[in-house]
Structures are given as structure tokens and as C-alpha cells.
């Protein structure tokens, strides 16, 4: 029983392969026709019921001695110049029909002679029969066609797959580098950029993906809140650093912003464009958003007391900036008259001196990175350095008249600059300042 099943399976397999060969898929039969040059395709019809051995016997028997010893089919098959003859037989209405495949490694002329010899067969077994050669297939041409078509497929696959793989490889390397730069900060192990531990200013974002996106574009002082509950680490940092809250442009981002403004000491607020998330922003969009940051006091009042959205506040602010030059021209003379009527006090003098530094204050305020400008008496820039290198820059440069930076003014910094004869120290805000030399004017952005 098992043997019969195995034979049936083999016959079915051979039948399928034979059908493919018959349809022109020569490569399906390459195991049988490995060294074949040509395949003779023939059809036969017998007036009676015959089987495969009858057809094969008729081919060998009736061509024997017909073409001489050199083209005798038995001899050619022994030497491998004629392959195994494939015969497919089916019976209908008392007649037998079928196909014959004769593999040949002879040349074209000899193969054509063999094909013509097949048509001389007039009996198969006890029945009259007729064989007709349908075609002689050039296997090498079929192989060449197969090679061309397959090569096209392989090339298309390479073109489709190779480029994405290269891009994926580059992106994987970049991602690995960014993740290596990513640190865990505080007891809550918040995802943060490598500059957060020592930077005077930090950017608070929503999640790990936001920090990674900012890292990709060179901003390394971001830290994530990782959820709607603001961690104690963020609250503590907000009391010591200049903090910019940078949230998504959706409702979730607005909710986190409101909570940050309530529990932390936020200095500035920036938002992603409406409907976008920080993690998907391009470098240009990130820089634009950070440059458009709004003081937290202004946002707090409008957001909670007047119920306005952040984007309404920004649009109103931009409108006021456009109207400001005209209003200034109209109102300035009146203000000057009022000042002249009052007794001159030190405060207006300091305010007047601060006005001369407005250009530099705006420059450092709009910078996405912590930066310090060292100016001479003529207000020319002597050096522009990262705030972490400020103390070294003060020691290395003489003739520093004023320092403008977007960092925190500390007592240590005041002591160092006063020893170097600096007259103006302008920063974002002060922290724990207990003494100040008379010769040094300490001014914050709020002043």
C-alpha cells in the first residue's frame, strides 16, 4: 500500500513537471534535461488503447536501422546524446492521445533528422498510429530567455531592497549614537541629553522620543517629564536653571504645559506647530519654535486668567511687535517729558545703560544653546562662548567691559568678573546673590 502511494505521488510530481515543460518552462525540467541542447515536441494519436511502454517501444523498434548506426536511438541513448524519452498518454472514446518529448544533445541537423524519423512511425502496439512533430525547442535559447528575465527580477529586487537597507543601516548607527548620548537623570531616571547636568538652561519636553529628536539636531540640554505627573527632579531643576517648556502642539501638550506652569518655575514656553509633535519636527521647525518662545509670566496670565490658547497668545504677541514701532514714535516724547519732570534716580540711569545692550540680550535670548557674549567698552564682541566655558573665557580675555549671557548669575560669577574689572553683567536671572561690588552693575532680562 505504501509503495503504491509513493508511486502515485511520483507520477503526480512528474505529471506537473511535464505540464510545465510542455507549456515552455524548460527550467522546470532542468534536472532531466541538464545537458540538452534541443527538445523534440511531438503529438501522437492511436486508434485503440495503448500505454506508455507501447509508445516508447514503437519509437525504438520502428526507427532501429532506419538512420544507420550513428543515429540509432538506442546507441545515442547509451552515449547520453539522446535523453530519457518522456511520454504522456490519455485515452478517450477508445482512442489514445498523447505527447512525446525527446531530449537531444545532437546538433540541429541531426536533431531534425531524428524528429523526421519519429513521423515515420505508423503503429503503436497493435493499433494504427500517427505521430506529428509540433516543434523543436532550442533549450539554450529558452535558458537565455530565462536568464534575462530572472536577471531583471534580481536586479529590480536589488534596487528596491539595497537602498532602503543602506538608509536603515545609517539610521540604525545614528540611533545607536543618539541613544549612547542619552543619559538617565535624577532618582526618576528621566531621559535627558548629556548637557543637562551642567547646563545653565534646560528644555523640558514630554517624552524620550522628543529628547532623541532634539539630540539628532544637536540640542543636548533637553530632559523629558515622562508622563502627565511632573517629577520632583524637574521641579527642583526649575528653581536652579533657566527652563523652557517645549511641548507638543496638541491637547496633551497643553495639559502638560498647564501642569508645568502650576508646579514648576518655568521661565519660557515654546510649542510645536499646531497638530504636530516635538518628536517629528525638523531642525528648522525646532529652531523656529524655540526662537518664538514666550515668557512664562505672560503665558500663565493669558492661559489661566483669560482662557486663551498658547497659539492665540503668540499671534497677539506677533501683532503687537508689528505695531510697536509706530506706537513708540507717538508715545516716546510724552514719556521723556514725564521723566524730565521727575527727580533723576539711579534706576533710570541703569535702565538707559541697559538699552544699549538690547541687541545682545535678544541675540542670547533667541539662541537655542547656552551662550555668552564678552564685550569691550565700545560694545564690540571680544568672544562668544558656551556658558560652561565663560569663567575660562573671562580669565583668558582682557578688557572685558560687559558680559551678556542666557545663564544664571551666581555669586561665584560675580566675584570672578569683579576681579577682572567688568562693569556690566547681564544674565537671565539671579540665584543666591548676597553681595555685589559697587562698580559692577548686575542686570537680569526681567530688569
UniProtKB/Swiss-Prot annotation:
Name the CDD domains on file. TOPRIM_primases (cd01029)
Reaction equation(s) it catalyzes: ssDNA + n NTP = ssDNA/pppN(pN)n-1 hybrid + (n-1) diphosphate
Pfam families hit by this protein = Toprim_4
Q: Which cofactor does it need?
A: Mg(2+)
Alphabetical list of InterPro entries matching this protein? DnaG_primase, Primase_DnaG_arc, TOPRIM_DnaG/twinkle, TOPRIM_dom
Q: Which HAMAP family match?
A: DNA_primase_DnaG_arc
Question: Taxonomic lineage of this organism?
Answer: Archaea, Methanobacteriati, Methanobacteriota, Thermococci, Thermococcales
User: What is the official name of this protein in its record?
Assistant: DNA primase DnaG
Cofactor, free-text remark: Binds two Mg(2+) per subunit.
* UniProt keyword annotation of Nucleotidyltransferase present: yes
Amino acid at each position: 500500500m505504501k509503495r503504491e502511494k509513493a508511486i502515485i505521488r511520483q507520477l503526480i510530481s512528474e505529471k506537473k513537471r511535464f505540464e510545465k515543460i510542455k507549456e515552455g518552462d524548460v527550467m522546470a525540467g532542468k534536472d532531466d534535461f541538464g545537458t540538452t541542447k534541443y527538445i523534440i515536441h511531438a503529438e501522437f494519436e492511436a486508434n485503440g488503447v495503448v500505454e506508455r511502454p507501447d509508445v516508447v517501444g514503437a519509437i525504438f523498434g520502428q526507427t532501429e536501422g532506419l538512420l544507420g548506426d550513428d543515429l540509432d536511438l538506442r546507441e545515442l541513448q547509451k552515449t547520453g546524446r539522446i535523453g530519457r524519452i518522456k511520454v504522456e498518454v490519455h485515452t478517450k472514446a477508445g482512442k489514445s492521445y498523447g505527447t512525446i518529448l525527446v531530449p537531444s544533445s545532437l546538433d540541429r541537423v541531426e536533431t531534425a533528422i531524428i524528429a523526421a524519423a519519429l513521423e515515420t512511425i505508423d503503429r503503436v502496439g497493435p493499433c494504427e498510429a500517427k505521430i506529428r512533430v509540433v516543434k523543436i525547442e532550442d533549450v539554450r535559447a529558452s535558458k537565455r530567455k530565462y536568464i534575462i528575465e530572472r536577471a531583471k527580477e534580481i536586479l529590480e529586487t536589488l534596487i528596491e531592497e539595497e537602498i532602503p537597507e543602506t538608509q536603515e543601516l545609517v539610521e540604525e548607527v545614528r540611533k545607536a549614537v543618539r541613544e549612547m548620548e542619552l543619559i538617565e537623570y535624577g532618582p526618576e531616571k528621566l531621559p535627558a541629553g548629556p548637557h543637562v547636568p551642567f547646563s545653565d538652561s534646560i528644555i523640558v519636553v514630554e517624552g524620550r522620543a522628543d529628547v532623541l529628536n532634539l539630540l539628532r539636531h544637536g540640542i543636548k540640554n533637553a530632559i523629558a517629564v515622562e508622563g502627565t505627573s511632573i517629577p520632583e527632579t524637574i521641579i527642583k531643576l526649575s528653581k536652579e536653571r533657566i527652563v523652557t517648556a517645549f511641548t507638543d502642539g496638541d491637547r496633551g501638550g497643553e495639559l502638560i504645559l498647564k501642569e508645568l506652569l502650576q508646579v514648576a518655575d518655568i521661565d519660557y514656553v515654546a510649542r510645536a506647530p499646531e497638530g504636530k509633535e516635538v518628536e517629528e519636527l525638523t531642525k528648522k521647525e525646532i529652531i523656529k519654535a524655540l526662537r518664538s518662545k514666550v515668557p512664562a509670566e505672560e503665558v500663565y496670565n493669558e492661559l489661566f486668567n483669560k482662557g486663551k490658547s498658547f497659539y492665540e497668545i503668540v499671534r497677539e504677541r506677533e501683532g503687537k511687535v508689528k505695531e510697536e514701532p509706530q506706537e513708540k514714535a507717538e508715545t516716546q516724547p510724552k514719556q521723556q517729558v514725564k521723566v524730565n519732570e521727575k527727580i533723576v534716580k539711579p534706576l533710570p540711569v541703569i535702565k538707559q545703560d541697559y538699552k544699549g545692550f538690547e541687541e545682545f540680550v535678544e541675540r542670547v535670548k533667541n539662541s537655542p544653546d547656552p551662550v555668552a557674549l564678552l564685550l569691550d567698552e565700545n560694545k564690540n564682541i571680544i568672544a562668544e562662548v558656551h556658558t560652561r566655558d565663560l569663567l575660562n573665557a573671562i580669565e583668558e580675555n582682557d578688557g572685558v567691559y560687559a558680559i551678556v549671557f542666557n545663564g544664571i548669575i551666581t555669586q561665584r560669577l560675580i566675584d570672578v568678573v569683579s576681579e577682572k574689572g567688568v562693569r556690566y553683567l547681564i544674565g537671565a536671572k539671579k540665584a543666591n546673590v548676597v553681595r555685589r561690588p559697587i562698580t559692577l552693575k548686575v542686570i537680569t532680562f526681567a530688569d
